[in-house]
């Protein structure tokens, strides 16, 4: 819940001096990316900019405090301020910020700029007190913000120092409007206006000018002069002499003498107590100070000129001038040290009543009240956890004694989930084991089940499926139905384990249950995870169209719940890329893989390994070996600098072995084969994949017998477990083994099986990747004219892809080949006497490649009637009457020229 006052413009007071000369300068702010107002405390930065902002509707205001160094808090308020300025135009960014569903601040800002691209009017965002930001991540994000913000957007930053925002670069490019302390200092005319409005008796212009010079135009000093003169009934000049040469670091003594010591005891205590509040309203004041009418007291303090300012138009929220507030808090620690814990406790209670648990935690921590902190956490910690207030929770839990956690084991569970979210898996188990050992009395069975659900998640994340399954089952046996979150976790883990074990049907059922529960209880990250798992299972079963439709539902969920920045989004676009690759939609597959890399741009490079593998696959399917080699260099570097799941290693090894196959690199394949451990089982898609890599390397090395043993066992497992996509891949590799070992009948048999199974999977690229050996076999099958219609159509499609991306046959009928052919001593006399035109040679090559007339017309970009004319002419010149005769004639010519066909 956001505090309204932090998003409200300070109210312009009637007695303030209108800084016309500075407002004139600010009037051109829309011509700059950044308007920067810097000066020490008390020079009127906020007052000036609030004057300039008056009347501007499309302007957001964000007042910072120390707590805004938390990235999530900063993001929530910044987006909320822009939403105020745009009237709710950026709803997707707002939802992502509220739900903490973004990978980083920069990725959130990137989404924001996408939405702002449709906003065409000038837009302003004011960030006040930026000097309070010390988090380098926020500085980096704001530099990104400034580089990429729309042209019609101006950022206005108020700070006591020069912020780390790439100021020099903006200045060089004339994109920076600057106002500093020298310009902010009051001139003589402004000082005269100020005193005329503040003092009951007017003073001479020369006198006000002298006082202005004495304090170097410092607005706070001028305000103190006027306040002191009113309180002490002394001359303003006397106060000016005392303030001459003073600066903020020496202001404390003056404020004690001239402000605190000149108010009554009741007002003094009010000032000191209320100063612990970063912002305040009537209810907070009543509870913290004991005053009966907080609003009336605040307005009275405001009238006395005691540095209190309104934070919103309704006058409900107030705050002290930062300089005065800091002074008061320091004095409060000295003068009211004994009462201070109780004051903070009162503030925490009031914040809780108003629904701001994070502010309440701030005061409970300041009070050192472990019991109050514990009570707040017991009631609100899980809500804060689900809103990613992780840093605040970690600080709070560290402040509680271990005994308090043991007395409230759900807080131990919370601490363990915090560790799990930070991938500190070993610490999770250590913490839970210690808690179970030290908790007094018999541990509640439900809590024990929640511990087991978390342990199960840790185990599966850490690559221990057996332990994960045991713990998940224990948790599900003991958890009541109402304990939905832990039941979702345990059900998801159990489903994932069954996926690993190859029990696809049961795994799919559990993942569908997980999705239903997660959607019902708005646990969106588990809903997304379950959909991704369902899609992977359907892919493994060979139901690629069903997998596609499940992915569509997942993309819709991401859009509806604004989950674009979750790392899981990368998982989804990656499996979409795998599916697109299988269907030979290579451009789309590559784009999807690159979008996955973009999602992970703020993570370690190792996280991009899977998407990089897909980019290599796309290059290999296109026959672009140079590009594949370049990408493989990067992939192999990542492999050597990280620890990966066996699925990741299997996919990376796959593209390496295929590359070695296409380039004939037996040395690399042999070296890899020597050092690669053989999996113990082959009961899931990633273990099948690694065994297939081993068999492919063995085939490349001519080790046909062991490769055949591997592939036959893989097929047996795949059939038993209904791993139909793996069976399709295995058949294609077995086909290559038979083809290369001269067992042409066996090769044709398994190729027919693979084509038939591809009617279910839709595979294209898995055939294409085998290159010319596959093309030769498909041509022969097409020439036999015995394939069923669907298989015939697929075979022709695969041939087109091979011809497009690999060393295709009609390339042999180029000008150089034809010249060598005509000079060959065994060339048929008919071809010498009636030579084909270059276009006719191209048409012959395409006929041999299995193209239909329509496909040839499309390939050569000519009309179908023109192709018929070319075919009639070349038939006549070759002395043939039928298409099959032309294919056989082309085959004879290729054999004569030394090409294996």
Curated annotation (Swiss-Prot):
Keyword RNA-binding: no
InterPro entries: P-loop_NTPase, Sig_transdc_resp-reg_C-effctor, TPR-like_helical_dom_sf, TPR_MalT, Tscrpt_reg_HTH_MalT, Tscrpt_reg_LuxR_C, WH-like_DNA-bd_sf
Residues at which ATP binds: 39-46
Activity regulation summary: Activated by ATP and maltotriose, which are both required for DNA binding.
GO molecular function, one term: DNA-binding transcription factor activity
Location of the HTH luxR-type domain: 829-894
Pfam families linked: GerE (PF00196), TPR_MalT (PF17874)
Location of the DNA-binding region in this protein: 853-872
Keywords, sorted A to Z: Activator, ATP-binding, Carbohydrate metabolism, DNA-binding, Nucleotide-binding, Transcription, Transcription regulation
Example of a GO biological process term: positive regulation of DNA-templated transcription
The protein's assembly and partners: Monomer in solution. Oligomerizes to an active state in the presence of the positive effectors ATP and maltotriose.
Function: Positively regulates the transcription of the maltose regulon whose gene products are responsible for uptake and catabolism of malto-oligosaccharides. Specifically binds to the promoter region of its target genes, recognizing a short DNA motif called the MalT box.
HAMAP family: HTH_type_MalT
Entry's family note: Belongs to the MalT family.
Stated name of the protein: HTH-type transcriptional regulator MalT
Gene of this entry: malT
């Amino acid at each position: 819940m956001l505090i309204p006052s932090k998003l409200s413009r300070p109210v312009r007071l009637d007695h303030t001096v209108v800084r016309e000369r500075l407002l004139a300068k600010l009037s051109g702010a829309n011509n700059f990316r950044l308007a920067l107002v810097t000066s020490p405390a008390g020079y009127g930065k906020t007052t000036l900019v609030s004057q300039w902002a008056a009347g501007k509707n499309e302007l957001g205001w964000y007042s910072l405090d120390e707590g805004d160094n938390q990235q999530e808090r900063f993001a929530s308020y910044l987006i909320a301020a822009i939403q105020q300025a745009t009237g709710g135009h950026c709803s997707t960014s707002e939802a992502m910020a509220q739900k903490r569903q973004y990978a980083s601040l920069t990725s959130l800002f990137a989404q924001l700029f996408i939405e702002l691209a449709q906003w065409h009017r000038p837009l302003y965002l004011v960030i006040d007190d930026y000097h309070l930001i010390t988090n380098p991540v926020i500085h980096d994000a704001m530099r990104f913000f400034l580089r990429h913000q729309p042209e019609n957007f101006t950022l206005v930053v108020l700070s006591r120092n020069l912020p780390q925002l790439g100021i020099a670069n903006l200045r060089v490019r004339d994109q920076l409007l600057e106002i500093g302390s020298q310009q902010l200092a009051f001139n003589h005319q402004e000082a005269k206006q100020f005193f005329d409005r503040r003092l009951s008796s007017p003073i001479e212009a020369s006198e006000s000018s002298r006082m202005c010079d004495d304090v170097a135009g410092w607005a706070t000093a001028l305000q103190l002069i006027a306040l002191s003169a009113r309180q002490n009934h002394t001359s303003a000049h006397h106060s000016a002499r005392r303030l001459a040469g003073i600066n903020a670091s020496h202001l404390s003594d003056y404020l004690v003498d001239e402000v605190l010591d000149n108010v009554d005891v009741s007002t003094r205590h009010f000032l000191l107590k209320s100063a612990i509040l970063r912002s305040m309203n009537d209810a907070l004041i009543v509870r913290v100070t004991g005053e009966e009418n907080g609003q009336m007291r605040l307005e009275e303090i405001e009238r006395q000129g005691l540095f209190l300012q309104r934070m919103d138009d309704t006058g409900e929220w107030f705050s002290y001038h930062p300089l005065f507030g800091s002074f008061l808090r320091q004095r409060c620690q000295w003068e009211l040290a004994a009462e201070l814990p109780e004051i903070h406790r009162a503030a925490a209670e009031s914040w809780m009543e108003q629904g701001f648990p994070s502010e309440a935690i701030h005061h409970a921590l300041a009070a050192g009240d472990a019991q109050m902190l514990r009570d707040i956490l017991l009631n609100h910690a899980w809500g804060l956890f689900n809103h990613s207030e992780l840093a605040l929770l970690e600080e709070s839990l560290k402040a509680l004694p271990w005994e308090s956690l043991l007395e409230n084991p759900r807080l131990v569970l919370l601490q363990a989930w915090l560790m799990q979210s930070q991938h500190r898996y070993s610490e999770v188990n250590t913490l839970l084991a210690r808690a179970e050992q030290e908790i007094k009395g018999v541990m509640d069975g439900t809590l024990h089940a929640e511990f087991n659900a978390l342990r199960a998640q840790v185990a599966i994340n850490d690559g221990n499926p057996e332990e994960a399954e045991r713990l998940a089952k224990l948790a599900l046996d003991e958890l009541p139905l109402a304990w939905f979150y832990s039941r979702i976790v345990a059900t998801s883990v159990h489903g994932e384990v069954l996926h690993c074990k190859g029990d696809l049907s049961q795994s799919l059922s559990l993942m569908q249950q997980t999705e239903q529960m997660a959607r019902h209880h708005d646990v969106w990250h588990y809903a997304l995870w379950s959909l991704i798992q369902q899609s992977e299972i359907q892919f493994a079963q060979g139901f690629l169209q069903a997998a596609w439709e499940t992915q569509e539902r997942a993309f819709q969920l991401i859009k509806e719940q604004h989950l674009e920045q979750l790392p899981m989004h990368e998982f989804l676009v990656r499996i979409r890329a795998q599916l697109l690759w299988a269907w030979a939609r290579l451009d789309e597959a590559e784009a999807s893989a690159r979008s996955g890399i973009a999602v992970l741009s703020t993570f370690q490079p190792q996280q991009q390994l899977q998407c990089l593998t897909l980019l290599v696959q796309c290059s290999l399917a296109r026959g672009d070996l140079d590009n594949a080699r370049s990408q493989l260099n990067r992939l192999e570097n990542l492999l050597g600098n990280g620890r990966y799941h066996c699925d990741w290693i299997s996919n990376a090894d796959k593209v390496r072995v295929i590359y070695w196959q296409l380039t004939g690199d037996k040395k690399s394949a042999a070296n890899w084969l020597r050092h690669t451990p053989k999996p113990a089982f082959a009961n899931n898609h990633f273990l099948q994949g690694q065994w297939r890599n081993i068999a492919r390397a063995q085939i490349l090395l001519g080790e046909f017998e062991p490769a055949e043993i591997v592939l036959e066992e893989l097929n047996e497992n795949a059939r038993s477990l209904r791993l139909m996509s793996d069976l399709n891949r295995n058949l294609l590799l077995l086909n290559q083994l038979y083809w290369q070992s001269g067992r042409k009948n066996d090769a044709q048999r398994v190729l027919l099986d693979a084509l038939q199974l591809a009617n279910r999977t839709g595979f294209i690229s898995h055939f294409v990747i085998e290159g010319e050996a596959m093309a030769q076999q498909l041509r022969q099958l097409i020439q036999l004219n015995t394939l069923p219609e669907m298989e015939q159509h697929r075979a022709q499609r695969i041939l087109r892809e091979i011809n497009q991306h690999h060393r295709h046959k009609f390339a042999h009928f180029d000008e150089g080949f034809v010249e060598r052919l005509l000079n060959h001593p065994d060339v048929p006399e008919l071809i010498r006497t009636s030579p084909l035109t270059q276009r006719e040679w191209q048409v012959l090559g395409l006929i041999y490649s299995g193209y239909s007339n329509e496909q040839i017309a499309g390939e050569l970009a000519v009309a179908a009637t023109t192709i018929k004319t070319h075919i009639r002419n070349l038939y006549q010149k070759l002395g043939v009457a039928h298409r099959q005769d032309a294919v056989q004639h082309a085959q004879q010519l290729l054999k004569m020229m030394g090409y294996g066909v």
